[in-house]
Amino acid sequence: MATIKVKQTKSAIGRLPKHKATLKGLGLRKINHVRELEDTPAVRGMINRVHYMVEIVEE
């Protein structure tokens, strides 16, 4: 299956608990942390929820 690289660009401090949990679900912990994930609708939905804190590095 295709993969997607996601990078955390902003801190989770002071964010909604749901958004913090979404970052944890994506496996992101710190600013500039990059994870390679499977490109599924569930992962895309999680990225859309926290789009202001992450960026897609590579598809």
Swiss-Prot record:
GO molecular function: structural constituent of ribosome
GO cellular component terms, semicolon-separated: cytosolic large ribosomal subunit
GO biological process, one term: translation
UniProt keyword terms in alphabetical order: Ribonucleoprotein, Ribosomal protein
CDD domains in UniProt: Ribosomal_L30
Source organism superkingdom: Bacteria
SUPFAM superfamilies hit by this protein: Ribosomal protein L30p/L7e (SSF55129)
InterPro entries with a match to the protein in the record: Ribo_uL30_ferredoxin-like_sf, Ribosomal_uL30_bac-type, Ribosomal_uL30_CS, Ribosomal_uL30_ferredoxin-like
Keyword check for Ribonucleoprotein: yes
Keyword Transmembrane helix: no
Binding partners and assembly: Part of the 50S ribosomal subunit.
Family stated for the protein in its record: Belongs to the universal ribosomal protein uL30 family.
HAMAP family: Ribosomal_uL30_B (MF_01371_B)
Name of the protein: Large ribosomal subunit protein uL30
Encoding gene (name): rpmD
